[in-house]
């Protein structure tokens, strides 16, 4: 009985926080009317080492004693498993957590003292917290996980034994990625040989020889195994893909140069397909949990493939755009997830393979327009199907750069189905998507002759550019070259069939050639048009003079 009276006496003589902890009649829940965080710049995207400023707003209906406010900045990594209603938390990790007291003390020196108190009304507490520079990644949220950062504040008792109320505010963090420091990529080459020739070539070797030794012997001197080298190199297709840079900024145009060395003349209206791909990999947490991989095709470019009958070579320039809504390359180690970008180039080396889009629309079919190919007396003029201009998309008033034509972001070619077909080969090159490019660093690297830009190995692309034969920079340049460069005007997309095959290229200042009908093409008038023309010639009403 005495113990109970003593406890009630201590409770009455203590602070309101003690009454709440031990079940007093005053409640902190009813005392707090509003509790939130106001950021100095609510729409700012923060970077490492930036200082987040703002105010904590606390509105009380009644005074409180013995309380403190603790500010925190925390980053969390969450990985989900499953999809939809079956989604559940698979893994969670705290990237960093830092806190500081903005009102009150950590631990009071005397447990009997009442500590800090707050009166009734509005209270504003300014704060400043610096974003760390280590173990931090760009904010992201998707179906399989998220990386989030939040500024929070906790109203607690003076000893920190109980959290009375809390509030938080999400912030967006962007980790800058400078692509000017990345080295230049070397061209990637793919060699395609006939399976029958490989089987016949392997029969001439001992059983212990492998495919790698076969490749080495085919590139050896002509004195050893000359017969096998001749057979394997006679029907070999070499595809070389070259990228000018290994890193690109959001909004950049990726210029791809493709060089093909064929063993015969070949043409295909949808022979080359370049795709900007984003691969997401969700790492496993154990042996029983496999790694998940997801693919997203961002944009695509389709170009015609025409192998010259004399040289059996083809050089094509293709363009891809990094969209403005893309996010930088993200790699989170230690059971996290990664987002990496790749340039995938496919070569369709069979005219029998039909290229379909996601909506089952055929590209390069019989409904395409034809453009003439350069010919000679020995090689007659042939035709190749040209992709329709509607694939280029509607051009705006300021979109006068035709280098971005034939780049589409919707209704793309189903690359997975196309790769399963025969005589379809290709390669993929990883690129880094960054946030900015330091132009001064890039210019210094280009001006320095000893900088390792392209390595010591010279490629077919560099040899051709050094010899003076500049490669085309866009798909439309290929069309102009195939049509004997009828006009170099950017806006002249209509081909004029009446020009002679040996006419030279025209400059921008030259007058446009006049149209002359070509006798090689049979032109027949439509029957309906003839009837409409006859009806127009007939007089619908008698003239006034005849009536008089």
Swiss-Prot record:
Residues spanning the signal sequence: none
Gene3D superfamilies membership: 2.60.40.640
Domain of life: Eukaryota
InterPro entries with a match to the protein in the record: Arrestin-like_C (IPR014752), Arrestin-like_N (IPR011021), Arrestin_C-like (IPR011022), Arrestin_domain-protein (IPR050357), Ig_E-set (IPR014756)
Database matches in SMART domains: Arrestin_C
Cited function: Required for the proteolytic cleavage of the transcription factor RIM101 in response to alkaline ambient pH.
Name the UniProt record assigns to this protein: pH-response regulator protein palF/RIM8
Species per Swiss-Prot/TrEMBL record: Eremothecium gossypii (strain ATCC 10895 / CBS 109.51 / FGSC 9923 / NRRL Y-1056) (Yeast)
């Amino acid at each position: 009985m005495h113990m109970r009276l003593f406890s009630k006496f201590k409770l009455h003589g203590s602070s309101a926080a003690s009454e709440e902890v031990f079940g007093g009649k005053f409640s902190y829940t009813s005392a707090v009317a509003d509790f939130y965080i106001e950021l100095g710049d609510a729409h700012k995207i923060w970077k490492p080492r930036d200082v987040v400023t703002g105010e904590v707003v606390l509105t009380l209906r009644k005074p409180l004693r013995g309380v403190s406010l603790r500010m925190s900045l925390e980053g969390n990594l969450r990985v989900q498993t499953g999809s939809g209603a079956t989604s559940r938390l698979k893994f969670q990790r705290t990237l960093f957590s830092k806190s500081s007291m903005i009102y009150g003390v950590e631990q009071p020196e005397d447990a009997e003292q009442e500590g800090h108190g707050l009166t009734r009304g509005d209270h504003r507490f300014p704060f400043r917290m610096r974003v760390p520079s280590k173990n931090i990644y760009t904010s992201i949220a998707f179906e399989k996980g998220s990386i989030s950062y939040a500024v929070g504040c906790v109203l607690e008792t003076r000893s920190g034994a109980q959290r009375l109320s809390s509030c938080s505010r999400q912030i967006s963090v962007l980790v800058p990625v400078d692509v000017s420091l990345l080295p230049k990529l070397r061209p990637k080459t793919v060699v395609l040989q006939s399976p029958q020739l490989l089987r016949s070539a392997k029969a001439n070797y001992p059983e212990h020889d492998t495919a790698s030794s076969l490749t080495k012997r085919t590139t050896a001197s002509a004195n050893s195994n000359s017969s096998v080298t001749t057979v394997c190199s006679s029907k070999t297709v070499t595809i070389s893909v070259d990228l000018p840079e290994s890193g690109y900024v959001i909004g950049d145009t990726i210029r791809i140069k493709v060089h093909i060395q064929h063993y015969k003349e070949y043409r295909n209206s949808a022979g080359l397909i370049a795709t900007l791909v984003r691969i997401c990999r969700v790492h496993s947490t154990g042996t029983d949990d496999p790694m998940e991989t997801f693919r997203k095709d961002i944009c695509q470019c389709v170009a015609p493939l025409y192998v010259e009958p004399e040289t059996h070579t083809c050089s094509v320039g293709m363009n891809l755009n990094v969209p403005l809504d893309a996010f930088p390359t993200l790699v989170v180690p230690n059971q996290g997830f990664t987002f990496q970008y790749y340039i995938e180039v496919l070569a369709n080396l069979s005219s029998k393979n039909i290229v379909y889009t996601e909506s089952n629309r055929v590209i390069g079919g019989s409904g395409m327009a034809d453009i003439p190919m350069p010919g000679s007396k020995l090689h007659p003029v042939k035709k190749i199907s040209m992709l329709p201009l509607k694939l280029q998309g509607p051009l705006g008033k300021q979109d006068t750069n035709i280098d971005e034509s034939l780049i589409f972001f919707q209704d793309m070619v189903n690359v997975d189905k196309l790769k399963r077909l025969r005589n379809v080969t290709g390669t993929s090159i990883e690129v880094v998507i960054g946030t900015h490019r330091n132009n001064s660093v890039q210019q210094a690297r280009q001006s320095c002759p000893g900088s390792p830009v392209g390595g010591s190995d010279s490629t077919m692309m560099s040899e051709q550019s050094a010899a003076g034969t500049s490669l085309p920079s866009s798909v439309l340049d290929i069309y102009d070259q195939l049509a004997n460069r009828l006009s170099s005007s950017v806006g002249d997309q209509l081909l004029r069939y009446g020009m002679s095959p040996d006419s030279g290229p025209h400059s921008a200042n030259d007058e446009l050639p006049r149209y002359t009908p070509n006798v090689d093409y049979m032109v027949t008038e439509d029957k309906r048009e003839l009837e409409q023309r006859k009806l127009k010639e007939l007089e619908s009403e008698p003239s006034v003079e005849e009536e008089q």
